[in-house]
Amino acid sequence: MLKIADKTFQSRLFTGTGKFSNRHVMAEALAASGSELVTMALKRIDLAQRDDDILAPLLSMQMNLLPNTSGAKNAADAVYAAELAREALATNWLKLEIHPDPKYLMPDPIETLLAAEQLVKQGFIVLPYCHADPVLCKRLEEVGCAAVMPLGSPIGSNQGLASKTFLEIIIDQAKVPVIVDAGIGSPSDAAQAMELGADAVLVNTAIAAAHDPIAMAKAFKLAVEAGRMAYESGLPSRVKMATASSPLTGFLDFVS
């Protein structure tokens, strides 16, 4: 069980809603993933229409919605988008995204921290997408964010956990849930994040862009469960030298 703010989740796999070929594939893939929390870009949905292609299936599935501020270029943009989302969707939950550079989509750490502090004061439950920067993640925690969402690698790049060393530090020092977001390109990447001790992962492109998104969603579901189970079971430490699992002496004496 994973608790974030006022909600408890059975699944530690959170999902995105972009890049699916159609709403039906999206709905089937989300169901196969077992995910209970989905994020969607405010700029991609019509908040005034409950039968919106993205919003309608999510509402019918009774998904927990995590609107995001993708497209915001600064703190002011993000706060404005958050207020619109809260009014239209009746939720205080928000994935805070501020990435002014359209090429690499790197999150702006300064604007993200400024927006997070303001949004928390306004009563939002803020989950900020950010660099895998241990200092920044600690600052976001200190201003009241309900979780932190450091990137594994650039959004949609499928490069996996390029930031592994820094993720380990963030996980070690965090007092709020750590959700690895962005760049997770395969189920093995998700399992690795969970083995490190991440509380959850958020996956979109790797599922939506797969040849069979529904099967891939199930693969991610199993990978996240396996990775978490491995972490909780206590993985053995890595060592430089070999350690035998069978006796190395006495064999000839035994058989002679």
From Swiss-Prot:
SUPFAM superfamilies: ThiG-like. Its main location: cytoplasm. Pathway: Cofactor biosynthesis; thiamine diphosphate biosynthesis. One of its GO terms (molecular function) is thiazole synthase activity. GO terms for cellular component: 2-iminoacetate synthase complex; cytoplasm. Its EC number is 2.8.1.10. Pfam families: ThiG. It comes from the Bacteria. Keywords: Cytoplasm, Schiff base, Thiamine biosynthesis, Transferase. 1-deoxy-D-xylulose 5-phosphate binds at residues 156, 182-183, 204-205. The active site is at residue 95. GO terms for biological process: thiamine biosynthetic process; thiamine diphosphate biosynthetic process. It catalyses: [ThiS sulfur-carrier protein]-C-terminal-Gly-aminoethanethioate + 2-iminoacetate + 1-deoxy-D-xylulose 5-phosphate = [ThiS sulfur-carrier protein]-C-terminal Gly-Gly + 2-[(2R,5Z)-2-carboxy-4-methylthiazol-5(2H)-ylidene]ethyl phosphate + 2 H2O + H(+). It is found in: Cytoplasm. Homotetramer. Forms heterodimers with either ThiH or ThiS. Belongs to the ThiG family. Catalyzes the rearrangement of 1-deoxy-D-xylulose 5-phosphate (DXP) to produce the thiazole phosphate moiety of thiamine. Sulfur is provided by the thiocarboxylate moiety of the carrier protein ThiS. In vitro, sulfur can be provided by H(2)S. This is Thiazole synthase. It comes from Vibrio cholerae serotype O1 (strain ATCC 39315 / El Tor Inaba N16961). The gene is thiG.
